[in-house]
From Swiss-Prot:
E.C. no: 2.1.1.197, 6.3.3.3
Major subcellular site: cytoplasm
GO biological process: biotin biosynthetic process; methylation
Organism the protein comes from: Bordetella avium (strain 197N)
Annotated protein name in UniProt: Biotin biosynthesis bifunctional protein BioCD
Annotated active site: K283
Length: 465
C-alpha cells in the first residue's frame, strides 16, 4: 500500500532542512524532552511496541530511548531525508517508514504507544488525524503528543497586527479543543519563550527547521511590508512564545456489547462480562426510563457492581424509543461525536442501544459510535429461529466497516445447529450459549460468568486473526 502523502511541499521543506535541523531546533528539543518525561510516567509494558509520527532527526526517539530502554520501534516521517538523518543519528534497531501520520498506512499491527513531538500541528485536521491514530492502539495503549496551541507566535502575530497585516504562520487550536476521538485523556500546556537576536534571525531559524509552509490562503508580504514587520518585532524585544500542548490519551481494555436486535439479551451479556472480568460498566445512551429503572441499575445488581465501577449515562431519556426519537420528545440534542469513554484502569464494558443501525442523532447510528469508540465488539444474539440471518447480517455490517468482533454470545434455548452455522458462515466464535434462565439474578450471573473466556484471551485471539 502506498502511504497517503497529501502535501509534498511540506515534505520538501523538511527534506531541505534535514542536515541542519538540530542546529536550530531549540524549542523542538525542549518539547521532546518534556513529552518524554510524561511518557516515561505511563504504565507501559516491557519492550513496548512504539510508533512515532514525524520522527524528524530523532530528538524524541533519543529522549525516550534513554528513559524506556529496549523497545520495538517504528519511526515514521513524511520527509525521506529526515528519515535518513534519523538513521544516522540513532543507534537503535528500528523500522523506518515514510508515511503521512495524518493518514497512516503500511503499518504492521497495533502499538502500545503512539507518540509525536511537534509534527501533528501540520495535520490538515488535527482532531480527525489523532482519531485515526487511535485505531492503531492496542487495548490499554497510549497516544501521547506535543503540538503547538493557540498562543504560539503571538508576538510575531502582534508585529503584523500593529501594521494591519496578517502573519503567514498557521493558526493553532485552543488547548481545550484538542481531542483524540472519543478516548479519555487530558491535555496540559506550557508557554516557552525563546529570544532571538532579531526578527531576521527568527525567520532564519524557522527556515532552518523547515517550518516555513504558510497557512492556507496567505498572501505573501512585499519587501517593504516584511521590513516593517521585522522592525516592529525587534522593537517588541525579538522574543517569541511557543505554547506547547501535551496530550495523553489511553485506549481502554474492554468491549462494546451490541445486539442483532432489541431485546436479544445485551444487558444480561453485559452483566455476565462485567462480572467475569471485574469490569466497569457504561451505558452511554439510556432510554425508556419512564417504564423501568434502566440497564445501569440492572447490571449493577446482577454483577454486584460497587458504585465506583458504574459510570452514569451521557444521556438518560424517558421514552422507550431509539435515542434520536426519544431525545426529540424531550427537546434534547444528542451529539454522538462528543461522547467520551470513561477514564478507568479497569476493563470496560460498554452497552449499546438496540442493534447496529439504531439512530443516535441526525448524523450517527450505533455502528458509527462503535467505530468512533474503537472498542472490539461482542455481539448478543438470540438462539432461536431466525438468528442465523440476523447474526450473519450484523457480522457482515461490522466487517464492512472493518470493526473487530471478538465473538457472539447467544441467549435462549440452546441450538447446536444455529451455533454451528454462525461459527461456520460468520467465521467467528460463539463464546457461550446462555440457556433460558428461570431466575435472572446475581447468583445466576455468578454461575454463568465463570463459563466465559478471559478478556486477555479474547484480545489475544483477535490480534492473531
Amino acid at each position: 500500500m502506498t502511504p497517503f502523502l497529501p502535501d509534498r511541499s511540506i515534505a520538501k521543506r523538511f527534506d531541505a532542512a534535514a542536515d541542519r535541523y538540530e542546529h536550530h531546533a531549540w524549542a523542538q528539543r525542549h518539547a521532546a524532552e518534556a513529552l518524554a518525561e510524561r511518557i516515561a510516567a505511563l504504565a507501559l509494558p516491557a519492550k513496548p511496541r512504539i510508533l512515532e509520527i514525524g520522527c524528524g532527526t530523532g530528538l524524541l526517539t533519543r529522549a525516550l530511548a534513554r528513559r524506556l530502554g529496549p523497545a520495538d520501534w517504528t519511526l515514521s516521517d513524511i520527509a525521506p531525508d529526515m528519515l535518513r538523518q534519523a538513521r544516522a543519528n540513532l543507534n537503535l534497531p528500528a523500522r523506518y517508514l515514510r508515511m503521512d501520520g495524518e493518514h497512516p498506512a503500511g503499518l504492521d499491527g497495533q502499538y502500545d504507544l503512539i507518540c509525536s513531538s511537534l509534527a501533528v500541528q501540520w495535520f490538515g485536521d488535527l482532531n480527525a488525524g489523532l482519531a485515526r491514530l487511535t485505531r492503531w492502539l492496542r487495548p490499554g495503549g497510549h497516544l501521547a503528543i506535543a503540538t503547538l496551541a493557540q498562543e504560539s507566535f503571538k508576538e510575531w502575530h502582534q508585529a503584523h497586527a500593529v501594521l494591519s497585516l496578517r502573519a503567514a504562520t498557521p493558526e493553532y487550536p485552543p488547548v481545550a479543543d484538542i481531542r483524540a476521538g472519543l478516548l479519555p485523556g487530558r491535555v496540559d500546556s506550557e508557554q516557552h519563550v525563546q529570544s532571538h537576536h532579531s526578527g531576521l534571525a527568527f525567520l532564519r531559524g524557522l527556515k532552518g527547521i523547515g517550518a516555513t509552509a504558510p497557512r492556507a490562503g496567505h498572501q505573501p508580504l512585499n519587501t517593504a511590508q516584511l521590513r516593517a514587520v521585522l522592525r516592529q518585532f525587534d522593537r517588541q524585544g525579538a522574543c517569541v512564545t511557543y505554547q506547547f500542548a501535551y496530550g495523553q490519551w489511553r485506549k481502554p481494555r474492554g468491549v462494546f456489547v451490541t445486539g442483532t436486535d432489541t431485546g436479544v439479551g445485551k444487558t444480561l451479556v453485559s452483566a455476565l462480562l462485567t462480572r467475569a472480568w471485574q469490569a466497569d460498566y457504561w451505558k452511554p445512551l439510556q432510554t425508556g426510563l419512564a417504564e423501568e429503572s434502566g440497564d445501569s441499575a440492572t447490571v449493577a445488581a446482577l454483577a454486584r457492581l460497587p458504585p465506583e465501577r458504574l459510570h452514569a449515562p451521557a444521556y438518560a431519556l424517558q421514552a422507550p424509543l431509539a435515542p434520536w426519537a426519544a431525545a426529540s420528545l424531550e427537546n434534547t440534542c444528542i451529539d454522538a461525536t462528543r461522547l467520551t469513554l470513561p477514564e478507568t484502569a479497569a476493563p470496560l464494558v460498554v452497552e449499546g442501544a438496540g442493534g447496529l443501525y439504531v439512530p443516535i442523532d441526525e448524523r450517527s447510528l450505533i455502528i458509527d459510535l462503535i467505530d468512533n469508540l474503537g472498542l472490539p465488539v461482542v455481539l448478543a444474539a438470540r438462539s432461536g429461529l431466525g438468528t442465523i440471518n440476523h447474526t450473519l447480517l450484523s457480522l457482515e455490517a461490522l466487517r464492512a466497516r472493518k470493526l473487530p468482533v471478538l465473538g457472539v454470545i447467544m441467549s435462549g434455548p440452546p441450538s447446536d445447529d444455529n451455533r454451528r452455522a454462525i461459527e461456520h458462515f460468520g467465521r467467528i466464535p460463539v463464546l457461550a450459549q446462555i440457556p433460558q434462565l428461570d431466575v435472572v439474578d446475581a447468583q445466576a450471573v455468578d454461575l454463568w460468568s465463570k463459563q466465559l473466556p478471559t478478556l486477555d484471551s479474547l484480545l489475544s485471539s483477535n490480534a492473531s486473526r
